[in-house]
Regions:
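A Zn2+-metalloprotease active-site environment signal
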Residues: 1-243
Length: 243
């Protein structure tokens, strides 16, 4: 499960057209995923050309992260926190549960506008208008807590600091509050419920790790600055339509 849905998504979503950016994110994701219990999957991490701050996972190891996440992330560990979280949704089969609930709906149409704000066809917009996206766009609060806990452990196992997960979520929360709920991070809070409580849970997990161990974990890597420089040289991403 997941291959057919990924093909639908790839046919609809505009991807970032820079091989080095795509390769960097895919390598970082695989660094994390290959140390989980589902190292057997053919994990694929792709960057969607959307300024909306969001990411999503399909069964089988297909992870999509929006360009907006890369632009907001200040270091590799912040991006790794998002990838570790989405990876855990696959490990725990949360995405399988969503697809089973969908009962054969068109996934490529179903998640396109809700998660990226980018519609490549009138059909996709029509699906949004009739509410066809809800089953794909949201995991339960319990699913999100499990993905946070597993994602925290996933990045640590890969030798990456889990502080990035905490600082990235804090950054998005501050942006959301300052914008009055209408910023480009709004999709994250819509699709990832209970963020404030989850930030507190991540802080609790951080407090349980010795400071010396946290300080020994990686925050950046050799490719981060190059990836960000290439990202800055891209043309503007398609903007989400005004709500």
């Amino acid at each position: 499960m997941g291959q057919q849905e990924a093909q639908q998504v790839n046919a609809q979503l505009p991807m970032v057209q820079d091989a080095q950016i795509q390769n960097y994110v895919n390598a970082l994701g695989n660094r994390i995923a290959h140390l989980t219990s589902r190292a057997d999957l053919n994990w694929q991490y792709q960057v969607v050309n959307s300024d909306v701050v969001n990411a999503f996972a399909l069964p089988g190891g297909f992870i999509y992260v929006n360009r907006g996440v890369l632009e907001r992330a200040s270091n590799m560990s912040e991006l790794a926190g998002v990838l570790g979280h989405e990876t855990e949704h696959v490990v725990r089969r949360h995405s399988v549960k969503q697809l089973e609930q969908a009962q054969g709906a068109n996934v490529g149409v179903g998640i396109l506008c809700a998660l990226t704000g980018v519609c490549q066809s009138g059909v996709a917009q029509a699906a949004i208008n009739i509410g066809g996206t809800a089953v794909f766009a949201k995991f339960s609060r319990t699913d999100e807590i499990q993905a946070d806990e597993g994602g925290f452990n996933n990045v640590m196992r890969a030798g990456i600091s889990p502080r990035g997960m905490y600082t990235f979520f804090q950054k998005l929360l501050a942006e959301e509050q300052s914008s009055g709920g209408g910023g480009s991070a709004a999709a994250w809070f819509s699709d990832h419920p209970g963020t404030q409580d989850r930030i507190a849970d991540i802080q609790r997990m951080l407090n349980q790790v010795p400071a010396s161990q946290l300080n020994s974990l990686q925050v950046n890597d050799a490719g981060w600055a190059t990836m960000k420089a290439r990202l800055a040289r891209l043309g503007p991403a398609p903007r989400a339509p005004a709500q």
